[in-house]
């Protein structure tokens, strides 16, 4: 069993390994095919039933673990499957090109759009290159440049959020991390184009907010959105990181809880077992939601679009 398996996934993976073993027997021993196939079908039914049972009772901490799953799809995975003709744009024109944020122009069906998203890494080398999805000021300045470009070209802005938070290093602070985030918040609130934001994994604090002020804010079913990580909250409140599961429940970090609080617009369903189990199906669901949102936002003129966004921001914090 690989290292990329969460504790609550292990019973499911045990069954799947048995199914794979029996499948290899069928290929090598034709005589026992009938009996083995019957057992395979029984185990598959049991696997589906077990997965449904486990995933229908996930707590907030388990959802947080899924949001960070090593095999969970990242921004570039969705760009590859949802959009056409993606042309990546790099650099902030001030300091450097931050690989923790990717962006560029693409087509959603035939419509030009601007895409901005956090990008994590798969292996050690890429994780370091992408700084684990934690952007420095130059990343947010790059995002700001692309936002303004989208407004100039009058094309919709689509963002994908997946970060544990903005990079907290001394160098990032010296280069103006808080100011870079603040400028993005201000700019996104007044951009004269439709903005659709989707949390696809971790939505961590100001690092997430810096590209998530929009006309529509959606979350994938097993993503999270919070002002601090459960571990960070537990460390501050109880001086004990082991109380992270309690913090996760108390903070209300899950998509369905945030929908109840009217902090997001839609929860996008994931396949049974999570997005990493079926990236294509997740991409189709995400694309469908993006097209629905764009169709709705297209019905508003510029003045109405900005007024609705303003009212949305002003109502945060009200029940």
Curated annotation (Swiss-Prot):
Acetyl-CoA carboxylase is a heterohexamer composed of biotin carboxyl carrier protein (AccB), biotin carboxylase (AccC) and two subunits each of ACCase subunit alpha (AccA) and ACCase subunit beta (AccD). GO terms for cellular component: acetyl-CoA carboxylase complex. Component of the acetyl coenzyme A carboxylase (ACC) complex. First, biotin carboxylase catalyzes the carboxylation of biotin on its carrier protein (BCCP) and then the CO(2) group is transferred by the carboxyltransferase to acetyl-CoA to form malonyl-CoA. Pathway: Lipid metabolism; malonyl-CoA biosynthesis; malonyl-CoA from acetyl-CoA: step 1/1. One of its GO terms (biological process) is fatty acid biosynthetic process. Belongs to the AccA family. Its main location: cytoplasm. Its EC number is 2.1.3.15. InterPro entries: Acetyl_CoA_COase_a_su, ClpP/crotonase-like_dom_sf, COA_CT_C. Keywords: ATP-binding, Cytoplasm, Fatty acid biosynthesis, Fatty acid metabolism, Lipid biosynthesis, Lipid metabolism, Nucleotide-binding, Transferase. Residues 39-296 form the CoA carboxyltransferase C-terminal domain. It is found in: Cytoplasm. This is Acetyl-coenzyme A carboxylase carboxyl transferase subunit alpha. It catalyses: N(6)-carboxybiotinyl-L-lysyl-[protein] + acetyl-CoA = N(6)-biotinyl-L-lysyl-[protein] + malonyl-CoA. GO terms for molecular function: acetyl-CoA carboxylase activity; ATP binding; carboxyl- or carbamoyltransferase activity. It is an enzyme of class 2 (transferase).
């Amino acid at each position: 069993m690989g290292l990329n398996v969460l504790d609550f996934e292990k019973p499911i993976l045990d069954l799947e390994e048995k199914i794979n073993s029996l499948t290899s027997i069928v290929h090598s021993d034709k005589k026992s095919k009938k009996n083995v196939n019957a057992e395979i079908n029984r185990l598959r039914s049991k696997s589906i039933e077990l997965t449904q049972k486990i995933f229908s009772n996930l707590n907030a901490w388990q959802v947080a673990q899924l949001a960070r799953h090593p095999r969970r799809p990242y921004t570039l995975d969705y760009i590859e499957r949802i959009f056409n003709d993606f042309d990546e744009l790099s650099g902030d024109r001030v300091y450097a090109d931050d690989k923790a944020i990717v962006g560029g122009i693409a087509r959603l069906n035939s419509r030009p759009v601007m895409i901005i998203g956090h990008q994590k890494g798969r292996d050690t080398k890429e994780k370091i290159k992408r700084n684990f999805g934690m952007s420095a000021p130059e990343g947010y300045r790059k995002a700001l440049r692309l936002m303004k470009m989208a407004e100039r070209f009058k094309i919709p802005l689509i963002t994908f959020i997946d970060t544990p938070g903005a990079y907290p290093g001394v160098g990032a602070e010296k280069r103006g991390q808080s100011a870079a985030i603040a400028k993005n918040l201000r700019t996104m609130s007044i951009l004269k184009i439709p903005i659709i934001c989707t949390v696809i994994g971790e939505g961590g604090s100001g690092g997430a907010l810096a590209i998530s002020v929009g006309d529509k804010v959606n979350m994938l079913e097993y993503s999270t959105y919070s002002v601090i990580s459960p571990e960070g909250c537990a460390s501050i409140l109880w001086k004990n990181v082991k109380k992270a599961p309690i913090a996760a429940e108390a903070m209300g970090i899950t998509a369905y809880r945030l929908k109840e609080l009217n902090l997001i617009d839609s929860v996008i369903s994931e396949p049974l077992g999570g997005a990493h189990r079926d990236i294509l199906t997740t991409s189709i669901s995400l694309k469908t939601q993006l097209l629905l949102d764009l169709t709705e936002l297209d019905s508003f003129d510029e003045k109405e679009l900005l007024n609705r966004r303003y009212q949305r921001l002003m109502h945060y914090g009200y029940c």
